[in-house]
Every structure is written in C-alpha cells, then in structure tokens.
Amino acid sequence: MELTINTEKETADILDAFIKVAPYLNSLVQDDITIGIYDTEKLLVNIPAKTFSLNVKAGDPLQEGDIITDAIRSNQKKTSMVPKELFGFPLIARAIPLHDENGRVIGGVGLGTSLEESSKLHDVAESLSAVVEQTAAAISDISESINGFSTQMSGISSQAKKVSESAGEIADISVTVKGISDQSNLLGLNAAIEAARAGESGKGFSVVADEIRKLATHSKENVGQIDQITKKIHSLLKGLEESIESINQHTDGQAAAVEQISATMQEISGSAQHLAKMAEKALEEE
C-alpha cells in the first residue's frame, strides 16, 4: 500500500513539475507553440499559443489516433505534420511519453508549432524563384534578339559598303565617259572646221560633225548628272554607315547590359532557389 502511495505521489510530482514549467516554455523559444500536459487518460493542462488555439481544454480525454495518445500507448516519441485544412494553417505536432523513476509511462507532453510563417516564406520563395526564372527567360530572348539584330545590322553595313564601292566604280566610269565626251566634242569641232574649209562638198559632213558635238555635249551633261547622283549616293551611304556604326555601338552596349542583367538574374535565381530549399527544409525540420 505504501509503495502504491509513493508511486502515485511520484507520478503527481512529475506531472505537476511539467505543469508548472509549461507556461514559461513559449517565452523561451522563437516559434509560437501550444503545449499540452497529459496523464494516461486525459489532458491535464493546455497552454495556448500566442496566435492560435487547438480548441482543447483540461479534462478532455485522450482520443484514439491523436499523436499524444500514440506516444503514450507506444512509449515512443512521435512527430506529425498537420495539414492546414484541419486548423486553417499548417502545424507540426510532437509528443513524448513521460516516465517515472522506474521507467513506467505516466503521461505525455504534446507540443504544437505553427508553420504558417514558414509556409508563407516557402510560398514567397517559390513564387520569387518562378518570377526570376520567367524574367531570366525573357532577358535571354531579348539578348538573342539583340544579337540577331546586331548580325542583321552587320549584314546591312556590309551591303552598304558594297553599294558604296559600286558607286565609286560608277564615278570612275563617269570620268572615263566624260573624257570620251570631251574628246568627241573636240573631234566634232575639228570636223566642223574641216567641213567649212571643204565648202559645198563638206556640207553633209558638217551635219554629221554637228550631231557628234551635240551628242558629246549631251553625254557630258548626262555624265554631270550621274556624277551629282553618285556624290549624293556617297553622301547618303556615308550617313548610313555612320548611323549603322552608332546603332552597333548602342547595340553592343545594350548586349553588354543585358548580359550583366542576365548574370545578376541568375544570381538572384540561385538565391531564390536556395531560399526556397531552406524554407522547405525548415518546414521539414520544424
């Protein structure tokens, strides 16, 4: 009889010690926790968390399937994730059996920790990671477009140089034609002089000489117009080349800036993924 009394007193003392300490535990940890102290039949005391309650009260009997009941019945530490559908937020529950000096199970302690903030952090990290990946993909597309545009501009510049070379060839031909025109005009003039000397017999030749001079004059005028057009083409091509060069410089600058942004986005993406993994790990370890 005395042994039974001592055992009951020891059990009461152990449970009472936990009951006295329980209210202080929430202040000792960073997480927001709720604590329940149980004997082998019922809840003795519940210390609610700062931001949530499990809607239990002292005297509530142990429920089959509850983590604390499993811990007490199996004499083992138990951990379980409680989905947010049950209480409106995710929760991790832990339970351990309590023993007397002889190792007999006399009750248990249940601990509930809200994972709401960790879950939010995980969701934000995953969302950030997704946004960063989308942004990085968009930047990659922009970079490809810039590189493609730069290639096209290089092609245009090359074609413009070829046109400029062709215009130069036209100018050279114009010089030659002008020389021929001047020579033809001189020959026409000499022929007209000789026709005049020939008198009546040279009239027919005089008409031909006049036509040669008219043709030479007309050719010279055309050559002058061609020369003006060629110079204008040269001027336009020079302006085009300068514009292309300016565009290429800006494009190179933009490409470099995009590469820098892309590198930065990759770093951010890596950090976001690391943050998501840390948040997920925190959820698993809570």
From Swiss-Prot:
<comment type="function">
    <text>Chemotactic-signal transducers respond to changes in the concentration of attractants and repellents in the environment, transduce a signal from the outside to the inside of the cell, and facilitate sensory adaptation through the variation of the level of methylation. Attractants increase the level of methylation while repellents decrease the level of methylation.</text>
</comment>
<feature type="domain" description="Methyl-accepting transducer">
    <location>
        <begin position="68"/>
        <end position="286"/>
    </location>
</feature>
<dbReference type="Pfam" id="PF00015">
    <property type="entry name" value="MCPsignal"/>
</dbReference>
<dbReference type="InterPro" id="IPR004089">
    <property type="entry name" value="MCPsignal_dom"/>
</dbReference>
<dbReference type="GO" id="GO:0007165">
    <property type="term" value="P:signal transduction"/>
</dbReference>
<dbReference type="GO" id="GO:0016020">
    <property type="term" value="C:membrane"/>
</dbReference>
<protein>
    <recommendedName>
        <fullName>Putative sensory transducer protein YfmS</fullName>
    </recommendedName>
</protein>
<dbReference type="InterPro" id="IPR029151">
    <property type="entry name" value="Sensor-like_sf"/>
</dbReference>
<keyword id="KW-0807">Transducer</keyword>
<comment type="similarity">
    <text>Belongs to the methyl-accepting chemotaxis (MCP) protein family.</text>
</comment>
